[in-house]
């Protein structure tokens, strides 16, 4: 509702920017956080031009102190937010045993700890606001991925973090239901949507950059990710609109491609039937054949 406040991480591009713009269109105050200072400044100006009161907060949400500052500044200017979008994320691929300790630290830091920091720090204030006002409503949206519901090969560390975000958010929803009727959660699981996530290495902190050259599997994963993301037909704006509709409907699982859930069903059937994981390429075997050949050194992917 107009006059309420939304906090959005990863707000300078992709889903985060669209969440910010559509929050502004709804008359909300908008708090925007991003690790890219120049992009954040431009995004803040764009959202401000849409008519919103905007607060920009630069920093890496993998660091708890950054999220604490984000909370403090939000409370100081607007009070407890009604909407929290823990949206910032990065992507990294390759064979799972080839991820370095720095790879794990970087991707876990942003994709999982960043979400955990947001939930840990903001949720108590949202619950407190709900307790003080019977009509107060709050909602937390955590951005996961279809990679949080299935396990595609050559995407190990990314899959791990996104599965963790789904588990975190399911637990958050269950825990909220124990203590309040006024704050709820949703998990966003987008498929391939044109955003900047396939180029997220541009924001990797210097101290967490990999030493040495990328492995062949990592180069293949990067190329496949860029191709898949850029070819997506559903826009970030479409996903943001679906997310706001889901918030209003108190819908927990949010999908960018609701007609592309067959792999999720197959995985659940594998689990229930104690069946070995199904071949993810069974419907497009030529892709699997090319990937196997490339990783075994027979031919390029």
Q: Which residue stretches match the model-derived regions?
A:
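Residue(s) in the substrate-gating loop at a strand-loop-helix junction
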Residues: 145
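Conserved glycine-rich Rossmann-like NAD(P)H-binding loop of the short-chain dehydrogenase/reductase
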Residues: 26-42
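Active-site helix of classical SDR
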Residues: 119, 161
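Canonical Rossmann dinucleotide-binding motif of NAD(H)/NADP(H)-dependent dehydrogenases/reductases
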Residues: 1-31
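SDR active-site lid
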Residues: 178-258
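Substrate-binding pocket helix/loop in short-chain dehydrogenase/reductase
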Residues: 95-96, 100-108
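The beta1-alpha1 cofactor-binding region of Rossmann-like NAD(H)/NADP(H)-dependent oxidoreductases
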Residues: 37-38, 58-69, 101
């Amino acid at each position: 509702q107009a006059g309420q406040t939304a906090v959005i991480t990863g707000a300078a591009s992709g889903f985060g920017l669209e969440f910010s713009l559509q929050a502004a269109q709804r008359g909300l105050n908008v708090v925007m956080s991003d690790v890219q200072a120049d992009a954040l400044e431009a995004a803040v100006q764009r959202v401000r031009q849409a008519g919103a009161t905007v607060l920009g907060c630069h920093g890496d949400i993998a660091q708890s102190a950054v999220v604490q500052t984000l909370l403090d500044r939000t409370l100081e200017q607007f009070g407890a937010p009604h909407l929290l979008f823990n949206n910032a994320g990065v992507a990294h691929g390759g064979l799972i045993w080839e991820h370095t300790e720095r790879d794990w630290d970087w991707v876990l830091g942003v994709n999982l700890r960043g979400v955990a920091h947001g939930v840990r720090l903001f949720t108590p204030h949202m619950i407190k606001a709900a307790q003080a006002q019977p009509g107060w409503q709050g909602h937390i949206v955590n951005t996961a991925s279809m990679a949080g519901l299935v396990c595609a090969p050559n995407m190990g560390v990314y899959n791990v973090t996104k599965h963790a975000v789904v588990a975190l958010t399911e637990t958050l929803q269950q825990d909220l239901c124990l203590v309040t009727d006024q704050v709820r959660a949703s998990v966003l699981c987008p498929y391939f949507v044109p955003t900047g996530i396939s180029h997220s290495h541009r924001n990797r902190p210097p101290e967490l950059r990999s030493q040495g050259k990328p492995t062949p599997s990592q180069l293949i994963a990067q190329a496949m990710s860029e191709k898949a993301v850029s070819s997506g037909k559903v826009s970030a704006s479409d996903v943001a609109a679906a997310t706001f509709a889901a918030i209003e409907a108190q819908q927990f699982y949010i999908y960018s491609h609701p007609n592309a859930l067959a792999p999720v069903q197959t995985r659940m059937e594998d689990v229930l039937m104690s069946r070995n994981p199904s071949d993810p390429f069974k419907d497009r075997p030529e892709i699997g054949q090319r990937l196997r050949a490339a990783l075994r050194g027979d031919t390029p992917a």
